[in-house]
Amino acid sequence: MFIFVFFTLMAQAVKVNVQNAVDFVQPLMGSDSDHGLSTGNTYPAIAMPWGMNFWVPQTGKMGDGWQYTYAAKKIRGLKQTHQPSPWINDYGQFSLMPVVGKPVFDEEQRASWFSHKAEKATPYYYSVYLADYDVTAELCPTERAALMAFTFPKTDSAHVVIDAFDKGSYIKILPDQRKVVGFSTRNSGGVPANFRNYFVVEFDHDFDAVHSVKDGEYQEGHEQEGNHVGAIISFKIGKRGEKVQARVASSFICEEQAWQNIQELGQADMEQLCQQGRTRWNEVLGKIEVEDENIDHLRTFYSCLYRSVLFPRAFYEKNSAGEIVHYSPYNGTVQKGYMFTDTGFWDTFRCLFPLLNLMYPSVNEKIQDGLANTYKESGFLPEWASPGHRGCMVGNNSASVVADAYLSGLRGYDVETLWQAVVHGANAVHPEVNSTGRHGYEYYNKLGYVPYDVKINESVARTLEYAYDDWCIYQFGKALGKSQKELKPFAKRAKNYEKVFDKESGLMRGRLLNGKFQAPFNPLKWGDAFTEGNAWHYTWSVFHDPQGLMRLMGGKDRFNQMLDSVFQLPPVFDDSYYGFTIHEIREMQVMNMGNYAHGNQPIQHGIYLYGYSGQPWKSQYWVRQVMDRLYTPTPDGYCGDEDNGQTSAWYVFSAMGFYPVCPGTGQYVLGTPYFQKMKLHLENGKQINILADGKGCYVDEMQLNGQMYERNYLDMKVLKQGANISFRLSEKPNMLRGTMEADAPYSFSNFSK
């Protein structure tokens, strides 16, 4: 009887109440990664949505980008982190670690064994049992502060180690006030010379003894500054189970502002703060309600949505007068207004920012305001910011992020400054960080492409992305009512993808300064003319004009054959450009999807291109394959780098049944819905209801607001008015639906004649 009832209940749909969405989040998803193979390269970010400060249990050595790995056996401390990626690494770091017995500062010696069986990680609360010390450590964050609690055994030798890290730090112990203050300067680049992360710590117990530490040596006195300083605060614990609490906050502006930020904690205790954090997370995640039978699918979905609302990070603070202010990571001054950071637009322009525009537009309006401030403070929009300009990746995709926001209806920020910024960035390169602006713009503007043989790497990738970015600027300018004289160059350059298409191979190919194509040419060679991919991946990076690409290839049939080949080719590769097999290659190889590389961004949209070529059922098949096979709510849950929300946002959109192939069009290309029911609660009070009936992945029939719908795309403007979308799914493809010319989504060639 029990068994029958159990399986009957399991077969019923699990309805997620919007108040409880956070309970499905698995922060450890993607954390079982290393240098050679990424299953996410994530860490459990204990934080608020878009929070200024994140917290992480630190298992890696100081300075190691892999600061938490699932396979690790020991924890070195509870660390404040601002790391967006292990490849970018961290800044503004310090940690607290409880120890018992001999006061030990060295991170190797103080590290304690732990088990995932005695670890609890949620977005708003973390706890772990530190076995070597019989101590339970707890943490609950706000946006800029945190409350920690350390439950000790009965002992006269309980300690909390405060590590300000190396590369320049300062600490001051104030025993009479139960306080410790300091700053850290450790960073990984992208900061002015005066960069500091000021931190303040306030305990609820009297100090029994204190030690200051400088460069590995215990010092007399309560104040130290040097390469690597810290403090050890000692307590007497009268009974087992007694808790020592620490209120912690930080500021990039000054110590006084850090004390201002600690007021976020108020007088709340751990339970109250956790409830506040839980409520906040449910407000954000609950914007999307999901109903389905498979609880692991729900866990995966909400874990991906959690990752989609962490970055970009808020880099602003509120002063004592209630004003929004920020330390500028570009010029080192304190300015009024918003600032956000820790995102790479090469990754996130694709669908992370479109997700914000659909579900959280008020957040992106602040981000856009911050982008205008970035331009004012540095002369360029960022392409990879952490916290300032970083030399990473290619493209000028800030143009996409800015244009898509405005074209999606976002307002209330300095649009004219952003127009000036995108035009400037299209015709200049940052004097010190050549990944900001356009490296090779002189060649591109003159020839229509970046040549392969002028010592500018990844030239085809740059050309393709610049062409799309020019289209974005053109669309943005049209919406602003700019003159044809201003717009004409961008419209013309939007076709520059044609300049690097090789008719002989049917693929994009490096082109020399003299106009000839590179030779020899191996379309399976990663890097070289491309960025973290090969010609089979990058040929499809004509987001704004798939019909134009189709014509270059010779029509729909050839286009479909070439797209089929991506999945049919074995996962062979040439890694000679790098001299070793980079992790992105290995991730493609082991996933058994041919040469499709979902673990990296360049081809993540490619699955949806069948909707342009009259074979949408193939998109439906491959989308479902990726979602079923390449995402799980486990420590190895991704198939490559999660990348600041991009790979997660792909899952979120794809679960809805549509995806923004070309940000800036206002269209979503249809795939197949993943859940039986979804409700999207928009900020304007409207609601999008998505229903799916039937088994299988193929869309047999679709209705929009009660009317039969044949097209392979949805318009954002229609959805934002509120919509009812229903799908009837089948185990067999419907090869008649969505096959007409009029069913295809937007392509620039069709609108620029």
Regions found by a protein language model. Give the residues of each.
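Bacterial Sec-dependent N-terminal signal peptides
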Residues: 1-16
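ATP-dependent phospho-/nucleotidyl transfer catalytic cores
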Residues: 469
